[in-house]
Amino acid sequence: MENSQIIFNKEKATQSILYVANRLERRDLHKIFKILYFAERKHLQDWGMPILGDTYIAMDAGPVPSRVYDILKIVRGDSYMSDTEGLKKMFAIEDWMYVVPLQDADLNKFSKSDIDALDWSVNTYGALSYDEIKEKSHDIAWRSTAKDFAISWESIAREAGLDSQDIEYITQTLESNKSFA
């Protein structure tokens, strides 16, 4: 299952940032990144598909969703891209690292399974400290990837407990879906 087979959903990404940020007490980038990673892993385990389809980079503090990070850098003002989509109307960044949601997430953008996985992740990991969630995110998928490289979806699927047969089925489904896109 190659990362190129997974299609990133920017609309779900922005709504997921809002959804998670509205449910966390500590809304720093690190916490949001990890909550999204665990939600994607859970959804992959339960449904064979990620929610956002972002590319997770193995960084020092754990997996980082690269496109979500790009979105937040646009809002923060340190991106080479400008805010052409009104992202700053959805959320702000304070003190370089805290996400302030300026509206609620549009729940119509999610399936029930998306919301279930996001809620599971918030409920399971939301109260953890920086060090605790960092340690939990330093899983085999993260450890088996070179620093600053993309963690393969196959590694994430294996970390979620899927076996080779499940991964092969998901790969075939993704290929079929791509031909209809």
Locate predicted features.
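Domain-edge interaction signal
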Residues: 1-181
